[in-house]
């Protein structure tokens, strides 16, 4: 975490070299709460795979029915959250205020209060993006904070959830059952889920670098039974255990992470897959759909 170190009652900031060392050493932040995460995983790599019109196609009746409500779990310092917001609303670079908040509202949460504070300070769309400090695995706090946000719009669930490179950190810190519960909570909270799972090689790298830094190893790493092809493992858990269906794979980022879109099966009648989106996938030969 990018938290100042207290020495002799004073606050001493990390030097640029120290901070850069921590940024480039995954495992230094055991919850994935790296400072300046976007330096080595820039938002543009995800955006190039995602159709800008995706939300309009999934929710053609908004904003007549109120804004689209999104949940971004593990938002870090908000760079990707802001980039997704601008991308899906086709907002030009440099725009800092917009009436688009009537179309799309995004609740962004992270376990690290320092990163959340930075996100709040730097967000160019404070009316549309809300940042909160939340340990998503704390059931009581999660229920209170998420329900408070949803109640403002008379809703009980989010339209879409974003889970971008978070599953590994939940898995390493909470074990197999923790990952299963995390995905259960997310699937119960959202009509759609966009998930970017980390592959197993990232688990090994995170554990190795943690040991290299002389820090305590992840409690669950060696006992995990869910391992191997992690994107497929995530698909199996969500589709077989949590009532979701995989409707789209948008391809892989340059760091070999797939972007997977799921839909809750109980929303099939109210949220049919847009034919235009299916055709676009066929034309570009990079989107795959499974229709029940």
From Swiss-Prot:
PROSITE patterns: BIN3_SAM. S-adenosyl-L-methionine binds at residues 46, 76, 110, 135-136, 164. GO terms for biological process: miRNA metabolic process; negative regulation of pre-miRNA processing; pre-miRNA processing; RNA methylation; tRNA methylation. Changing residue 72 to A: Abolished O-methyltransferase activity. Residues 53-274 form the Bin3-type SAM domain. Its main location: cytoplasm. It catalyses: a 5'-end 5'-phospho-ribonucleoside-RNA + S-adenosyl-L-methionine = a 5'-end (5'-methylphospho)-ribonucleoside-RNA + S-adenosyl-L-homocysteine; a 5'-end 5'-phospho-ribonucleoside-RNA + 2 S-adenosyl-L-methionine = a 5'-end (5'-bismethylphospho)-ribonucleoside-RNA + 2 S-adenosyl-L-homocysteine. This is RNA 5'-monophosphate methyltransferase. It comes from Homo sapiens. The lineage of its organism: Eukaryota, Metazoa, Chordata, Craniata, Vertebrata.
